[in-house]
Amino acid sequence: MALKTLPIEARPRERLLARGPSSLSDTELLAILLRTGIVGKGVMQMAQELLSPALPDPATGALRGGFGGIGGLLQADADALKRIKGLGPAKRTSLVAVLELARRMLAQTLPKRDLFHSPRAVRDYLQLHLGGKPHEVFSVLFLDSQNGLIAMEEMFRGTLSQASVYPREVVVRALHHHAAAVVLVHNHPSGQVQPSRADETLTRSLTDALRLVDVRVLDHIIVAPGSSLSMAEEGLI
């Protein structure tokens, strides 16, 4: 449905001005940012497509469709956005700029707080950094004794296994940062957040290695477009 066919008071922009942004859905807020659709695809339809689940192509394995929600969309880069018909350079640039602003905001605020007094902030931060990546990435959050963020480092990219992530490298980086604890994190581009046996085996291996240098593994978080899972909350750590 084209926005111009709606009564003026029902249009997203007018409703935002009258009632505030919290009264709008994710789709409506995104439609305001996109501004216009294309022939045969209204702006609301385009916004819905962007937020739809990402699905792997059966033939190539490449992701198609949307980005699985706001978290996945904000992680997408300009090239990934090209798979949505109707997103020209101007719209892609606007979306990527929003992503960068969100990243900078989180980078400024997250190190100033105790991460585990605000688990929502941790998940939002990880969703922005990993949620929409098309390939699997394993990273580590290095924390101080107050659970404040010292650094986040990517340790490996590709299919995750115990053989691909070397505990010694993680231990070396933890000692370099004088970390008291770490949070392990990796993404599942498929959209499924349930941990695999390889995830559980790797977590145990890293926990054992880091324990030898008095560094605690607080959690292993799995991130997918629009969702995440804490292995600690699931009783797997």
Curated annotation (Swiss-Prot):
This is UPF0758 protein Aave_3773. Disulfide bonds: none annotated. A motif (JAMM motif) lies at residues 186-199. It holds the Pfam family UPF0758_N. Belongs to the UPF0758 family. InterPro entries: MPN, RadC_JAB, RuvA_2-like, UPF0758, UPF0758_CS, UPF0758_N. It comes from the Bacteria. GO terms for molecular function: metal ion binding; metallopeptidase activity. Keywords: Hydrolase, Metal-binding, Metalloprotease, Protease, Zinc. Residues 115-237 form the MPN domain. GO terms for biological process: proteolysis. The lineage of its organism: Bacteria, Pseudomonadati, Pseudomonadota, Betaproteobacteria, Burkholderiales. Zn(2+) binds at residues 186, 188, 199.
